[in-house]
């Protein structure tokens, strides 16, 4: 079995080797390149389709393969690659070939001279086919500029060793793929030839062949391809060239030269502040030096590549450029780990500079060093430097141990000096050798005089050495020019041109002397001053550079009237036009101008407009109409002429891909950005998809859905709304779609007019002509014609009405976007920018005018549908509703006339129809009556005739007739006679049956039948009448009488019954209707009462039970004082129902949050880890470990210093015999796990401030139950109480004054070294159990006040693995806890237990006061505003016994804050949580570093002297809407009042707040506004804008100053309203009597009065309350101040307390002198001079920070002897030798060189995320400039194998 597995393993390894071999991979990549199909395939196909013979097919195939082979060879052969890879080379080759190709195919007789034979011509054509395929194969890669499959070959080229084999195999693979491809093409062609349908259509085949023969398709294709590529890369002729300056300048003349900028050598450090300003000046002496570098060659093969695809990235604060080159791939060789490797992201500027230097040094070139020698030299140098550093460090320690306090022990910073004797140095602020905390802050950076004074400063502390690098001979420093540059253009804070870089290029003939000048002396590392040793001619040569500051079109328009001459703009901005909509000229002459009110209204308009609109530069297409207002105020004091212009900037609506491109640069492809959300504020790259917590597919918010569902369910009158039918929805969608389509059509038309040359001028003239024609010719002629026609028709003329309507029509000139100006004033540059003509009250010719009385009786619904009373004139004289809209249908003149005629005709027809109908009815009736009469007469006549016959026959008397009647009466049923009232004259008609003669046979039968029928009908009729009468009697209906001839006796009773019935019916209906609501209200009352009673009774019982149970814990406690000390003063009788549920809810969230703590490692940003590791100030102590862990008396290390290391957790004395730790990944992960709770490891002073024991015991009991929050559940209550007792006893005995001092490095040094050195969890500080007693070493946390021998209490450490949310006191959150970092549910546990209401606490955080009766109210966040680096003294005034401090998770940059339920604070049954949510929106605590929340203003002396009146009444704005309707009264007890209200020196009165009246704060406001404006951009200065001292301006400035992390926005409807208001106001400002237009505009809803308030006193707080303005936190990390980046390393000295605090409450100020802001405390003062406050010395501070890191890294990069186990001869000889034995015995466990080196490389270049590299670069290698990111390059390292 083992044998089988062995065989299997061998087979697998063999297969892997075969697969990874160069040949197989080359075949694979070559086969892949088959699929990158280009135009060259078309020629190959054409040769096969045309069937011109096998010769052409063979030649085409040969050319195709030859071209591809040349491309593969060009990968390996550099000259061929240069020739084919350069874009302009291909362009130059293409153009002649295109010309030749065109003539060859269209005019073959040019080449046919008649004497040539056909055979030779055919041969020439075969050669042309070969040439076509060859050349187009070479063109293939530039037609598709970046085909991925072709680039794969280039990528793999740098990974394989045998490059030629790879090229050959990839070419073979490509050949195989193309053979298969051509075989496939042959099969397809064969199928086409065999297909009958294609073969039968001979016409199609012949046409195809003719077109292919004429080859027009390929000529067109070739032409389009060349033009396309010329569009992508600007041709060298058209490109904007650099400015040429021809004359050679001396050094004296250079002071007058302002255009020529100086090349920075700090390019080698990565500063990309190159400038484009000046081109190379040819020096006359060196004209013939490089004669071959002529314009043609540099035009086509310019390796400097001035036209590179670069983007200009602005710094928002200082408007200076950082040229970002991180996205470029640039291959160059660099030395990495002692070996030369190819870096694919090498800085192009460095390679350019290196090649320039190589040209200068061609005389001194030496042989190339082999790679082994290079590596050995690197290893040797590294070893030497490491040993030197170690020796130097140990010597310094020994000197310090001898007791010497000489300042030479400490390593000092190297300063940049100009002259060694005069000691003139750069100021510390500008010294490039000084980084981080050595720099001070600058307040007044921008005045030229102070800048010049700063430059020549004598500093005595600096070292008098001149440190010059190898290139300093070429690049000498010229201070005068440097000074001149400062005077001309102030130096910014951020992207500082380092003073060392200001040099001049000397001429090339001085290159020999350069090497003599650059000889170094290794002992003192100085160089002899060049000016003393050599006489150098002062002929110099400037290097072309990019413009340091490029402006765009908008900035150029803003500064066009400036006095200083500025260069042309270098950036193409968005296509925009500046439209001036109002100009107010105030001159000395009495010119008629607008009133002051009008001007101020215009200014208010422009200010609001500026705030409203945002310029979106990241999207490629901006479909919304964006208009930005800029107010330009130009003052000319000499002329005393002031002109104010209010202008709108109109942007083009089409996608503008030229936007933000540098002129003359290559068009860079935009990065691939996607939007995967429905609403997304910013575009994000898919590279960082893993950083987003929710993707589109998993963004189901279940809680949000439930929330809305239950809200509707539990509402009072909540009903589920039934949506409209689907038809209405579809109609609405169709309507919106149609409106959108029309809007897009209008935009397209306007853009078309805007792009065509001279179209605007033509259109403008046509519009003006149409306006004049309409107003003065067409309409008057129509009026005259109409009235003459009325007079001809004998009607009154309507001259007055028509002329009145004609006069009312106004033709207002508008800008291109429709902003109204006036009737007579044309817009500025209207011929180029465009014009619109708006017709107000357009005249409509009517045939007659109705009286106005008729309008009043109209339906009001019809008035609403009335069209708007304006239109826009089109080019053809039509009317349109909107600019560029479709022409609307004008009301016709004859239409009402035709309607009136139709009405009259209809009326006439109606009358005629009525008459005809009556006549017709009368005739019908007459005919019918006449027929009936005739019939009756005939019947009578026949009857009489029949009787006469009967009488004549029978001669009987007429009595039988009457007898018959009697018989009939008697035959009626007697029973029915009772009910029938027969009138006396009633006649019963017999049926008209002929009476037969008596002697007929059938007479008896017939008579019997007739009698039966009569009886049956009469019986039925009587029964029906009886039934109806019975019904009437039963129902007693009083509506009818039973007998119509007489009134019933009880008729009145029936009427009253009827009324009673109706009333009952109404009441019952009303009761039924109200029954639902009554029942609902009743049930709700019952439900709430019962629920309240049940819950409160349960709550009281549970509380009593808990109190009874907690009494058991009190008996165990003996410390009565601490029991009385801080017990919550909660009244047990008061019952808080809401708070109970809220508390339980927050507990649930608390447990849910903490349950994920131990598994979620991804939320820790590795960049932050490296940031913290870089901040550690203690070096790598592998060499000193034996000394520090020696139990005996140390030789040179005092116990005091050893105690300091013990305090910092660098070592434990117990771990002396443990093995030497190493870098291991499990240690890394353990550290990551422990980092979540590291903030909970507190010192004794922190434990002393724990909450009273009643609360402690209760929380501890809960902690025992909730095992989710605790790692160790085996804690004993008794030990815990002992622990607390000792803690509190110790805290009482501490001195109050020194109790809260902070030691700087105690926490994170320990953490960093724990990570780097430790592996054993047992004795680690992080993994210690909470009640473990460290008996071996007693840590003394207060070094000043205690005698170490007498007082040695046993102290305890608390584990970080236990959630201290169970222990820490949170009561201060309800008061003034100003350092809370983010909003957490844990706060609810404690703030809801006290008497302070939630609303008050929320308003306190926001800065809003709801109740005016509240006496003590401070703007709390104004305190935070002033709590910057220099406000540490303020904290010392607070009484620390009452100000408790909580500890929250300060890693707010990670995902853990996303897991907190911030977004779901608005729970459905607790609307009070909405206030928390709104508070979070206004002031979220998500910023990780305290600096981000602060105003970085240095001078705090004023604020310390000020006191806030604690009883001052203030009405602050209510910023959250949910708080408006609620008010509360707070009982301010004396114990709740803190000293901070009187002592905290936050100048709240100076700062103000958005809602307070700013008029009382004017003096301080002016000062603050001035300070704030100092840091603004140069463009704002160039405007020379007045600082507004008005209330609104001051308030806005203060508001923006406070909420700089937030943005104000409003909804789109408000934006549209404001745009409309601007348009209307622009018109009103120019009218003499604007009242009529204003009223009409308000009636038409054009102008909304609520948006444009008439009063100026409407504050921002009111706007926010009205819902017009919405405060949102800024999602982007906007830099508040340039000083934040420049002095970023100051944060090491004063990081937030939650991060670095272990044993003291407050921090003392460090590294910064508050009085002299431009001077920083020296290192020796910081370490030695302040010994009272800081008795212990961190040894590593002897070295500078850069040398410190160098020592650590060199120790880890220690390569060489493998068997050496970190041995240092200093420690391994003499008395110290025994200390090293314990390390040498464990040699087998450590491969110290290889393993540690590998782990260290994993540490430096981890394979986690790319953006971490930038952070490593910034923080580890001590660079704090963002532009130096290009130095941190990703390199492809070879696979490292551990031997």
Swiss-Prot record:
It is found in: Plastid, Chloroplast inner membrane. GO terms for cellular component: chloroplast inner membrane. Residues 251-264 have a biased composition (Acidic residues). Residues 244-281, 557-576, 582-647, 724-744, 1527-1586 are annotated as: Disordered. Residues 1543-1562 have a biased composition (Polar residues). Keywords: Chloroplast, Membrane, Plastid, Plastid inner membrane, Protein transport, Transmembrane, Transmembrane helix, Transport. Belongs to the TIC214 family. Residues 269-281, 730-744, 1527-1540, 1563-1580 have a biased composition (Basic and acidic residues). Involved in protein precursor import into chloroplasts. May be part of an intermediate translocation complex acting as a protein-conducting channel at the inner envelope. One of its GO terms (biological process) is protein transport. PANTHER family: PROTEIN TIC 214, PROTEIN TIC 214-RELATED. Residues 590-639 have a biased composition (Low complexity). Its main location: plastid. Part of the Tic complex. The keyword Transport applies. Coiled coil: none annotated. This is Protein TIC 214. It comes from Nandina domestica (Heavenly bamboo). InterPro entries: TIC214. It is a multi-pass membrane protein. The chain crosses the membrane at residues 18-38, 64-84, 87-107, 124-144, 172-192, 217-237.
């Amino acid at each position: 079995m083992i044998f089988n597995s062995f065989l299997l393993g061998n087979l697998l390894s063999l297969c892997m080797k075969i697969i990874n071999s160069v040949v197989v991979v080359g075949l694979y990549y070559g086969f892949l390149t088959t699929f990158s199909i280009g135009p060259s395939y078309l020629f190959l196909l054409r040769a096969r389709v045309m069937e011109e013979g096998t010769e052409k097919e063979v030649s085409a195939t040969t050319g195709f393969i030859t071209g591809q082979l040349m491309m593969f060879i060009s990968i390996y052969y550099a000259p061929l690659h240069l020739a084919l890879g350069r874009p302009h080379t291909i362009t130059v080759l293409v153009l002649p070939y295109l010309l030749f190709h065109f003539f060859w195919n269209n005019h073959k007789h040019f080449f046919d001279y008649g004497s040539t034979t056909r055979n030779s011509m055919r041969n020439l054509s075969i050669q042309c086919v070969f040439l076509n395929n060859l050349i187009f194969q070479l063109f293939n890669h530039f037609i598709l500029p970046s085909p991925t499959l072709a680039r794969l070959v280039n990528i793999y080229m740098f990974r394989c060793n045998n490059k030629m084999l790879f090229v050959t195999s990839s070419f073979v693979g490509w050949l195989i793929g193309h053979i298969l491809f051509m075989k496939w093409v042959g099969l397809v062609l064969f199928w086409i030839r065999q297909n009958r349908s294609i073969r039968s259509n001979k016409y199609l085949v012949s046409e195809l062949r003719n077109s292919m023969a004429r080859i027009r398709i390929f000529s067109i294709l070739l032409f389009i391809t060349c033009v396309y590529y010329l569009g992508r890369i600007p041709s060298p002729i058209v490109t904007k060239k650099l400015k040429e300056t021809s004359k050679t300048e001396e050094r004296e003349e250079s002071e007058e030269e302002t255009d020529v900028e100086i090349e920075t050598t700090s390019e080698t450090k990565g500063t990309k502040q190159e400038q484009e300003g000046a081109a190379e000046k040819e020096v006359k002496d060196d004209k013939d030096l490089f004669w071959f570098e002529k314009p043609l060659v540099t035009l086509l093969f310019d390796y400097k590549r001035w036209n590179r695809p670069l983007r200009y990235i602005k710094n928002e604060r200082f408007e200076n450029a950082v040229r970002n080159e991180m996205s470029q791939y640039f291959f160059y060789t660099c030395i990495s780990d002692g070996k030369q490797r190819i870096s694919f992201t090498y800085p192009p500027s460095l390679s350019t500079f290196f090649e320039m230097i190589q040209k200068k040094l061609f005389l001194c070139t030496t042989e190339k060093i082999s790679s082994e020698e290079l590596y050995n030299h690197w290893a040797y140098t590294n070893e030497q430097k490491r040993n030197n550093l170690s020796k130097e460090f140990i010597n310094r320690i020994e000197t310090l141990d001898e007791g010497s306090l000489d300042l030479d022990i400490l390593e000092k910073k190297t300063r940049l000096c100009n002259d060694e004797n005069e000691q003139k140095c750069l100021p510390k602020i500008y010294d490039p050798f000084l980084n981080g905390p050595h720099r001070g802050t600058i307040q007044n950076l921008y005045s030229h005089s102070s800048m010049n004074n700063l430059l020549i400063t004598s500093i005595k502390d600096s070292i008098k050495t001149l440190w010059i690098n190898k290139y300093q001979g070429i690049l000498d420093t010229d201070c005068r020019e440097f000074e001149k540059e400062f005077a001309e253009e102030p130096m910014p804070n951020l992207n500082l041109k380092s003073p060392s870089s200001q040099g001049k290029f000397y001429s090339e003939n001085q290159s020999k002397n350069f090497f003599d000048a650059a000889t170094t002396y290794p002992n003192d590392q100085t160089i002899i001053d060049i000016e003393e040793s050599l006489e150098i001619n002062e002929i110099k040569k400037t290097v072309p550079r990019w413009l340091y500051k490029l402006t765009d079109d908008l900035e150029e328009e803003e500064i066009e009237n400036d006095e200083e001459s500025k260069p042309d703009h270098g950036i193409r901005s968005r296509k925009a036009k500046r439209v001036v909509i109002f100009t107010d000229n105030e001159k000395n002459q009495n010119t008629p101008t607008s009133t002051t009110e009008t001007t101020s209204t215009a200014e208010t308009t422009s200010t609001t407009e500026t705030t409203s609109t945002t310029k979106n530069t990241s999207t490629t297409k901006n479909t919304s109409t964006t208009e930005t207002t800029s107010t330009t105020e130009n003052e000319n004091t000499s002329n005393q002429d002031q002109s104010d212009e209010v202008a709108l900037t109109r942007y083009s609506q089409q996608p503008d891909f030229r936007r933000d491109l540098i002129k003359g640069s290559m068009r860079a492809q935009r990065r691939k950005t996607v939007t995967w959300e429905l609403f997304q504020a910013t575009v994000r790259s898919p590279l960082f998809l893993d950083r987003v917590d929710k993707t589109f597919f998993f963004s189901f918010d279940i809680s949000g859905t439930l929330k809305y569902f239950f809200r509707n369910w539990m509402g009072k009158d909540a009903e589920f709304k039934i949506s409209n039918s689907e038809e209405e929805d579809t109609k609405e969608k169709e309507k919106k779609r149609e409106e959108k389509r029309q809007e897009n059509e209008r935009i397209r038309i306007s853009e078309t007019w805007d792009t065509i040359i001279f179209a605007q001028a033509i259109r403008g003239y046509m519009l003006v002509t149409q306006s004049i024609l309409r107003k003065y010719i067409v309409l008057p002629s129509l009026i005259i014609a109409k009235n003459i026609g009325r007079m001809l028709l004998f009607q009154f003329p309507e001259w007055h009405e028509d002329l009145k309507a004609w006069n009312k029509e106004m033709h207002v000139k508008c800008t291109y976007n429709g902003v109204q100006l006036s009737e007579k004033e044309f817009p500025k540059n209207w011929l180029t920018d465009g014009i619109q003509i708006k017709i107000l009250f357009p005249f409509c010719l009517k045939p007659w005018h109705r009286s106005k009385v008729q309008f009043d009786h109209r339906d009001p619904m019809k008035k609403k549908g009335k069209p708007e009373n304006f239109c826009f004139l089109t080019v053809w004289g039509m009317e349109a509703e909107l600019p560029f809209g479709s022409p609307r249908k004008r009301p016709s003149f004859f239409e009402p006339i035709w309607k009136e005629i139709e009405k009259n005709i209809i009326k006439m027809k109606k009358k005629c129809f009525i008459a005809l109908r009556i006549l017709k009815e009368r005739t019908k009736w007459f005919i019918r009556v006449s027929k009936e009469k005739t019939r009756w007469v005939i019947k009578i006549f026949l009857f009489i005739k029949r009787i006469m016959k009967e009488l004549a026959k029978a001669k009987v008397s007429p009595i039988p007739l009457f007898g018959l009647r009697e018989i009939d009466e008697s035959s009626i049923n007697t029973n029915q006679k009772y009910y029938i009232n027969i009138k006396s004259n009633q006649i019963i008609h017999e049926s008209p049956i002929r009476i037969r003669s008596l002697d007929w046979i059938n007479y008896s039968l017939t008579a019997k039948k007739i009698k039966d029928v009569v009886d049956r009908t009469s019986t039925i009729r009587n029964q029906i009448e009886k039934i109806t009468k019975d019904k009437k009697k039963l129902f007693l209906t009083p509506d009818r009488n039973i007998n119509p001839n007489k009134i019933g006796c009880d008729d009145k009773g029936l009427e009253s019954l009827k009324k009673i019935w109706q009333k009952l019916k109404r009441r019952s209906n009303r009761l039924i209707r109200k029954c639902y609501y009554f029942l609902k209200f009743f049930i709700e009352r019952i439900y709430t009462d019962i629920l309240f009673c049940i819950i409160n009774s349960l709550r009281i019982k549970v509380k009593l039970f808990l109190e009874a149970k907690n009494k058991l814990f009190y008996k165990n406690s003996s410390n009565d004082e601490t029991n009385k000390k801080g017990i919550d003063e909660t009244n047990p009788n008061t019952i808080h129902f809401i708070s109970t549920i809220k508390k339980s809810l927050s507990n649930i969230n608390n447990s849910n949050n903490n349950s994920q703590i131990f598994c979620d490692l991804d939320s820790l940003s590795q960049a932050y880890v490296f940031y913290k590791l870089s901040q550690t100030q203690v070096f790598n102590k592998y060499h000193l470990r034996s000394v520090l862990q020696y139990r005996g008396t140390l030789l040179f290390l005092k116990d005091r210093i050893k105690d300091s290391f013990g305090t910092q957790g660098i070592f434990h004395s117990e771990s002396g015999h443990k093995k030497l730790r190493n870098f291991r990944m499990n240690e890394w992960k353990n550290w990551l796990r422990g980092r979540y709770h590291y903030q909970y490891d507190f010192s004794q002073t922190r434990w002393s401030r724990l909450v009273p024991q009643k609360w402690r015991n209760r929380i501890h009991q809960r902690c025992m139950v909730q095992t989710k929050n605790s790692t160790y559940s085996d804690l004993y209550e008794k030990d815990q109480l002992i622990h607390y007792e000792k803690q509190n006893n110790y805290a009482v005995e501490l001195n109050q004054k020194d109790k809260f001092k902070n030691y700087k490095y105690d926490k994170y040094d320990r953490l960093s070294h724990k990570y780097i050195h430790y592996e054993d969890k047992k004795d680690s500080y992080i993994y210690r159990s909470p009640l473990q007693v460290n008996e071996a070493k007693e840590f003394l946390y207060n070094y000043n006040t205690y005698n170490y021998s007498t007082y040695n209490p046993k102290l305890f450490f608390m584990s970080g693995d236990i959630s201290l949310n169970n222990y820490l006191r949170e009561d201060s959150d309800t008061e003034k806890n100003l350092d809370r970092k983010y909003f957490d549910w844990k706060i609810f546990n404690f703030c809801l237990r006290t008497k302070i209401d939630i609303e008050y606490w929320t308003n306190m955080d926001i800065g809003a006061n709801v109740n005016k009766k509240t006496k003590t109210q401070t703007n709390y966040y104004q305190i935070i505003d002033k709590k910057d680096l220099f406000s540490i003294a303020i904290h010392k005034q607070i009484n620390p016994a009452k100000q408790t401090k909580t500890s929250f998770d300060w890693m707010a940059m990670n995902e853990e804050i996303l897991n907190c339920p911030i977004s779901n604070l608005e729970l459905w049954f607790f609307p009070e949580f909405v206030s928390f949510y709104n508070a979070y929106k206004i002031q979220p605590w998500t910023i990780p570093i305290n600096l981000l929340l602060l105003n970085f203003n240095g001078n705090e002396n004023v604020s310390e002297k000020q006191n806030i009146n604690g009883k001052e009444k203030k009405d602050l704005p209510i910023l959250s809407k949910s708080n408006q309707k609620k008010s509360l009264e707070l009982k301010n007890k004396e114990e709740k009042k803190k000293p901070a209200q009187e002592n905290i020196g936050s100048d709240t009165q100076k700062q103000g707040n958005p809602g307070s009246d700013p008029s009382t704060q004017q003096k301080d406001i002016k000062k603050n506004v001035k300070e704030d404006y100092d840091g603004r951009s140069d463009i704002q200065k160039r405007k020379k804008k007045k600082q507004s001292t008005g209330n609104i301006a001051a308030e806005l400035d203060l508001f923006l100053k406070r909420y700089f992390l937030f943005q104000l926005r409003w909804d789109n409807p408000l934006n549209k309203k404001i745009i409309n208001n601007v348009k209307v106001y622009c018109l009103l400002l120019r009218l003499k009597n604007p009242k009529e237009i204003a009223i009409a505009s308000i009636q038409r809803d054009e102008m909304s009065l609520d948006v444009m308030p008439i009063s100026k006193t409407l504050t921002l707080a009111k706007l926010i309350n009205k819902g017009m303005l919405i405060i949102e936190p800024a999602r982007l990390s906007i830099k508040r101040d340039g000083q934040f980046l420049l002095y970023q390393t100051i944060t090491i000295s004063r990081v937030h307390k939650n991060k670095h605090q272990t044993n003291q409450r407050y921090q003392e100020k460090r590294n910064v002198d508050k009085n002299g802001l431009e001077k920083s405390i020296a290192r020796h003062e910081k370490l030695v001079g302040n010994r009272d406050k800081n008795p212990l010395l961190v040894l590593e501070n002897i070295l500078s920070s850069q040398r410190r890191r160098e020592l650590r890294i060199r120790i880890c990069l220690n390569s060489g002897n493998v068997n050496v186990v970190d041995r240092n001869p200093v420690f391994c000889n003499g008395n110290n030798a025994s200390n090293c034995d314990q390390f040498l015995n464990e040699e087998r466990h450590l491969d110290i060189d290889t393993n540690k080196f590998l782990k260290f490389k994993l540490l430096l270049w981890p394979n986690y995320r790319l953006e971490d590299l930038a952070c490593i670069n910034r923080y580890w290698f001590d660079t704090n400039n963002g532009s130096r990111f290009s130095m941190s390059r990703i390199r492809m390292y070879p696979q490292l194998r551990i031997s």
